[in-house]
Amino acid sequence: IIQESMKPETKIENLIKSVDFVVNTMDEPYIGYTAAKISRVCVKYKIAHYIAGGFDAHLSSTGELIVPYVTPCVECYASHFKRKLKDWKPKKHPVKSRYKEIGGLACLSLFSSSYACIEIIKCIAGLVDLEDKYKVRGEFLFNDMSLTYLDVEKNPNCPICGGGLHES
């Protein structure tokens, strides 16, 4: 477990290449940044990793299990969101000082962490064939208690994972 702050210039290759699996729960300075930085190094060294959800706008997100050259990578997800959110404009939020006013439901973070644990155990223990059965990121919708999954696909032309081979 590493409990240090990460800055843009922080060198992480030596930390990552010496492990078998990485769980990224860093949400500072921003989850998108930490996910991209860590995931690119993990893919380079063919290290499976999990980008956790369960906080802020990702409160009920399942997170992403990324197995290099098998599942969509962080860049595949970024491209997906760029396409899907191309014309999206945020609505003005009714609460002005959100950092003081808005909290989250603990049960949603519990959902995200429990889901992540199950997916991580399945991957590490080899309980499912990830070449055939893996789940992309999902969202638990509290209003109707449903679980929906994104339609992210591995991009064969991805600059990070496209064209690479996975070794079991």
Regions flagged by a language model, labelled:
Residues 2-10:
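Conserved SAM/SAH-binding loop
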Residues 14-168:
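Glycine-rich phosphate/adenylate-binding loop
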